[in-house]
Amino acid sequence: MIRAYEQNPQHFIEDLEKVRVEQLTGHGSSVLEELVQLVKDKNIDISIKYDPRKDSEVFANRVITDDIELLKKILAYFLPEDAILKGGHYDNQLQNGIKRVKEFLESSPNTQWELRAFMAVMHFSLTADRIDDDILKVIVDSMNHHGDARSKLREELAELTAELKIYSVIQAEINKHLSSSGTINIHDKSINLMDKNLYGYTDEEIFKASAEYKILEKMPQTTIQVDGSEKKIVSIKDFLGSENKRTGALGNLKNSYSYNKDNNELSHFATTCSDKSRPLNDLVSQKTTQLSDITSRFNSAIEALNRFIQKYDSVMQRLLDDTSGK
């Protein structure tokens, strides 16, 4: 049994490598060798690439077309058998589909294909004149539309949430000095906002791949002295005073703020930071609601696809049963 390429392309390739071409549906297709040669002549690269949004297991990226035998198996996997009755309805449908595949390969400007996308395009090209495929295409297009919107929202929400997290770290530091009625230095004696531990990370590489780090690396830096040597940090003042973030720059910043019962500048500073981040918090709530809505629509499209496939299989099975019973 060959596992579906949509779920895990690595498993699909592993299964294909274990079988002979002769065991695949399209091994005897009259156009198999022609399509293999066409892919080679057009320098089309088909690859499997790990996608963390789709794949549960990590695997190494791999160019499939480097292995001609494997390429032949991929094409034989989706190609149907030649029609027994030449000139009949099925044969005409099949020939039209193969013609579309050839036209697509010859005319498409894209020569770099991820396996999932290539297989989907080949499938639709082969069967584009069938009403069931038209319905499937509408559903899949809906899935892709909502999927793309969901991905963009996730990326935006990750950035917004990361900036809000940095503000929460700053607010916690301010509150610590407020509770002790002390003085906070936000310049050369500031905490280093580049410290991964502030955000709950223990691994430096994971932190460098985080949304927080991507924001912080755009910030200006302050040079401080540590044990007689220079070290660069991203101070609270660097972050708050920078334009390179969603909330923009906070102006007129001092190097330090002290607690004073009569004129509590530290408390005022805490309020200013809170006010600065409040619209960001509102935006995170708004985007979270939008993401929930778009995810619901995406899941509904998947559910519709599953229901359609189940219904289609049921109808086809009944037709086959009726035919065999005659």
From Swiss-Prot:
* Subcellular locations according to the entry: Secreted
Its GO CC terms are: extracellular region
**Major localization listed first in the record, in broad terms:** secreted
ATP-binding listed as a keyword = no
Q: Which Pfam families match?
A: LcrV
Record's keyword terms, sorted: Plasmid, Secreted, Virulence
Give the SUPFAM superfamilies listed for this entry.
Virulence-associated V antigen
Say which domain of life the source belongs to: Bacteria
Q: Is Secreted there in the keyword field? A: yes
* InterPro entries named among the record's database cross-references: LowCa_resp_V_Ag (IPR005413), Vir_assoc_V_ag_sf (IPR036139)
Described by its record, this protein's role is as follows:
Possibly involved in calcium regulation of YOP expression, which includes the export process.
User: What's the protein here called?
Assistant: Virulence-associated V antigen
Instruction: Give the source species.
Output: Yersinia pestis
